[in-house]
């Protein structure tokens, strides 16, 4: 999970709501905590109450891809992570009222959740993704196509 947007991390109530939802998930939550998020968690003294959520230092891009690919589900407010989860076939719950990547919402591969404990839990526990998925971002073979084009001189 990632939570870093100011609208989700600048008020104690929202951070507390998100963390309490995480604590009720069936699977453990790994939370690479952005400095702003970490500061708020410390300010509201929540970390000592976390049993299901492990706060870790921010991680690199490749590590995040690894975690995303191997996650049961991703919960995030990140714009980019929604798209990466879609490409990696990992269901995503986005903690926002809207998304730049509206195509990821098709087939429930990504769903939007309000900053409300019940809504977050409902979306995490009850969203079923469609078996069908559009290849909006390609088939992952762009590098192969580029190399073939360069080699062929076309």
Please give the residue ranges for each predicted region.
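Nucleotide-activated sugar donor-binding and catalytic core shared by glycosyltransferases
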Residues: 1-25, 31, 37-154
């Amino acid at each position: 999970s990632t939570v870093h947007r100011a609208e989700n991390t600048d008020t104690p109530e929202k951070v507390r709501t998100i963390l309490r939802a995480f604590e009720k998930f069936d699977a453990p939550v790994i939370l690479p905590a952005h400095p702003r998020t970490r500061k708020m968690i410390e300010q509201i003294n929540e970390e000592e109450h976390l049993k299901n959520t492990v706060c870790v230092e921010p991680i690199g891009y490749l590590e995040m891809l690894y975690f995303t690919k191997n996650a049961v589900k991703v919960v995030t407010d990140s714009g980019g992570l929604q798209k990466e989860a879609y490409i990696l076939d990992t269901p995503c719950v986005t903690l926002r009222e809207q998304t730049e990547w509206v195509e990821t919402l098709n087939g429930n591969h990504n769903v939007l959740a309000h900053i409300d404990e019940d809504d977050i839990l409902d979306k995490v526990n009850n969203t079923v993704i469609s078996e069908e998925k559009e290849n909006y971002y390609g088939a992952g073979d762009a590098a192969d196509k580029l190399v073939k084009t360069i080699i062929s001189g076309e």
